[in-house]
Amino acid sequence: ALGDKVQFVEQNAANDIPTCATIVNGFVSDGVDLILANATPALQAAVAATDSIPILGTAVTEYGVALDIKDFNGTVGGNVSGTSDLAPLDQQAAMILELFPDAKKVGILYCSAEPNSVYQSDVVKAELEKSGVTVSVYTFADSNDVAAVTATACDENDVLYIPTDNTAASCTEAINNVAEPAGVPIVAGEEGICKGCGIATLSTDY
């Protein structure tokens, strides 16, 4: 069995970006043979730490955005490869319109520190606006202002959309505690967020 020949070292940064860097730098110092980076912050930390140790990304939404690669064609190159969990954004936008045909205002809620979320927001916003829906974007810097930003978004919109977003995923309880009493439904970009505070999603099956 592979486990008899390979030593696996698992470290959890708990969605803290500085901790990602600390963990990855430790891996580099230890001379590991491969780094598996789960989610965008971990991938970014790994790429910043080494250009020689092979890196595999997983649950990374959009590599071109995450690694600031212009004209990204699907191949990162160098020591980096991996898989993407990018959802069908056009179909998510269509689902919002199908579920809420009378909605006039849709708010998009995400963490401003996550470039993948910005990308998803831009795509979904453009798709919704094609149908004449007014779309407003609401961003929080970190978990500390999630509740306040969610409250503002709920006050001003008929429906909310939250893309695949690591910070939002860790704050679904806080988001739900605001949105549910306000009676504002949330369509989520991925399954975890949907389970925590959403009513529907169309996403990657993890």
Predicted stretch roles:
Residues V60-E62, D85-P88, C111-N116, A141, ...:
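Short coil/turn segments
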Residues P115-V184:
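Pocket-lining segment of extracytoplasmic ligand-binding domains
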Residues N12-K70, D165-E180, V184-G189:
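Beta-alpha junction/loop-to-helix N-cap segments that form part of ligand/metal-binding clefts
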Residues A1-F8, A126:
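Short, polar/charged alpha-helical segment
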Residues D33-I35, K104, D158-V159, G198:
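Conserved acidic residues
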Residues Q7-S29, T139-D155:
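Structural motif
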Residues S81-E129:
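An alpha-beta-alpha
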Residues A66-L97, K195-Y206:
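Short beta-strand elements at the ligand-binding edges of bilobed clamshell
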